[in-house]
Regions:
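Bacterial Sec-dependent N-terminal signal peptides
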Residues: 1-17
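Extracytoplasmic redox metalloprotein regions
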Residues: 13-189
Length: 189
């Protein structure tokens, strides 16, 4: 997904900030919030190799345990009763449907994840759990307090055992955006 066409070419298009709250602008903002990765696939795919981790090792049950959410409105009716929630292939299928809140993936014809990125919605959306815990209707703008960013990053093969220990110590709802820069773990809510 590309930023709205009235963007000034910056990541945020801030130069063209507007008070126009038309339905078209609101819909464009919602699309950016939900689906735009701002190019972070470079980190999540090229550096952290999370596309491989998700494709090979992350089944929906594991994804839900680390706090990822599934948008029930992105699922065909009755699909959850027909799929294996213990299979990473099901996670790939959910990504193809854009049903994993805050995670965008490019999946090729052979069901391999070639690019993986995250959006604002990963941390700043949740679901109402109307289908089951972690699966329901989106609630954009609500914090995902179940999200365990440290446990997710710790799955990466690109980090050391010492880093994994730090990431795994954070727990749900906490994150330290400076850890990779200063090496000091100070996760915040």
């Amino acid at each position: 997904m590309q930023p709205p066409s009235n963007s000034a070419g910056t990541a945020t298009g801030a130069e063209n900030a507007t008070d126009d709250l038309s339905q078209a602008n609101l819909a464009a903002g919602q699309r950016v919030f939900r689906f735009d990765t701002f190019g972070d696939e470079q980190f999540w795919t090229d550096t952290a190799k999370m596309n491989q981790v998700v494709e090979q090792n992350v089944d929906p049950t594991t994804a839900l345990k680390v706090g990822l959410k599934v948008d029930a409105d992105g699922l065909p009716p009755g699909i959850l009763q027909k799929v294996d929630l213990k299979s990473p292939a099901t996670t790939v299928a959910l990504l193809k449907m854009n049903a994993v809140v805050g995670v965008q993936a490019v999946v090729d014809a052979n069901n391999h994840i070639t690019r993986l990125g995250i959006t604002c919605a990963l941390c700043h959306s949740t679901v109402d759990n109307s289908v089951m815990p972690g699966i329901g209707h989106r609630k954009d703008g609500w914090p995902n307090r179940d999200l365990n960013v440290g446990a997710i990053i710790a799955l990466s093969p690109a980090i050391t055992a010492a880093q994994k220990a730090v990431y795994n110590s954070w727990g749900p709802g906490k994150y330290d955006p400076r850890f990779n820069i200063d090496g000091k773990s100070n996760p915040l809510v």
